[in-house]
Amino acid sequence: MDGSHSAALQLQQLPPTSSSSAMSEASFSYKENLIGALLAIFGHLVVSIALNLQKYCHIRLAGSKDPRAYFKTKTWWLGLFLMLLGELGVFASYAFAPLSLIVPLSAVSVIASAIIGIIFIKEKWKPKDFLRRYILSFVGCGLAVVGTYLLVTFAPNSREKMTGENVTRHLVSWPFLLYMLVEIILFCLLLYFYKEKNANNIVVILLLVALLGSMTVVTVKAVAGMLVLSIQGNLQLDYPIFYVMFVCMVATAVYQAAFLSQASQMYDSSLIASVGYILSTTIAITAGAIFYLDFIGEDVLHICMFALGCLIAFLGVFLITRNRKKAIPFEPYISMDAMPGMQNMHDKGMTVQPELKASFSYGALENNDNISEIYAPATLPVMQEEHGSRSASGVPYRVLEHTKKE
């Protein structure tokens, strides 16, 4: 009787043990998601601060009489260190959380850049004018924060370790091979229209960037996951797939940066940021869902809420970048022969080059063959000026003597 009673007790205790194991596994998966999300948010925030620090360093040197190069300043090196730290955090986040969660969190860098840009404004605004000018940025930041919260809350849970066997199995699976075939065909078509037909539309260029970026993030997750497992004691560096993924990661990142550079030469950076974020995030999530099977086993409600979070984050980023205005470039070197009324200034002995209280050091005046046929060379004061000198001469050049040729 005692033996049968104890066996019955053991049978009754088995179901709670299995359910508690499932609950602990889900809790551990959620903790890994949270660690990855926090690392990604921290990384994007630090990268945004680093970029603004380096930009501040360049602006400060351009507006002062400091002859030092930017790489000789502590501010620029601090920005470089923070950038490397932030990129390391983003890279490590892929080892803990699903790709579908980490990729949309790049909206954090857009939010941080908008806030930092407002804080570092030097002009004084009345509250009414300030709100009118930056209302879209505030609304966009709010929407992006709400979207980020939904992404973290309803993201798919990571259940699989990035071992060499798992990565190889995903790489040769027929869904991913079919996806790769479609992506290669689409990439070749877009590249043909871009190079041969001069299709310089921003959507074409950023689609090329997004297709390359999807492969970059897929390989980054594999490389980061295998490195973390190796650090934890489960060595994965002896698998050839690790080096295949590493080479693909570097190659796609380099070509992605090249296309982004070409896009920045033709379009405004705010437009590139908004359109590029939407396209890259959408294609990267699709690639992650196919390669790593991120949404397998997830219920419909979680998938719909995750998609809603993506849409809200897209709208927030669009509003933030929509509020930015194009910067008007300033050209320090002026072509004097293109200025109307130049001959009258010579005749009246007026100042040829006005005094400019700025850091830009003007070079010699440009020669004009048409004017030299009428006027003899002007006699200028004996002064020497070198490009990049510590300060520009405060004494304006004046025409001392001229004679007309008969």
Swiss-Prot record:
One of its GO terms (molecular function) is magnesium ion transmembrane transporter activity. Glycans are attached at residue 166. It is a multi-pass membrane protein. GO terms for cellular component: membrane. The chain crosses the membrane at residues 33-53, 76-96, 101-121, 135-155, 171-191, 202-222, 240-260, 271-291, 300-320. Its main location: membrane. It is found in: Membrane. Keywords: Glycoprotein, Membrane, Phosphoprotein, Transmembrane, Transmembrane helix. The keyword Zinc-finger does not apply. The modification Phosphoserine is found at residue 372. It comes from the Eukaryota. Belongs to the NIPA family. This is NIPA-like protein 3. It comes from Pongo abelii (Sumatran orangutan). The gene is NIPAL3.
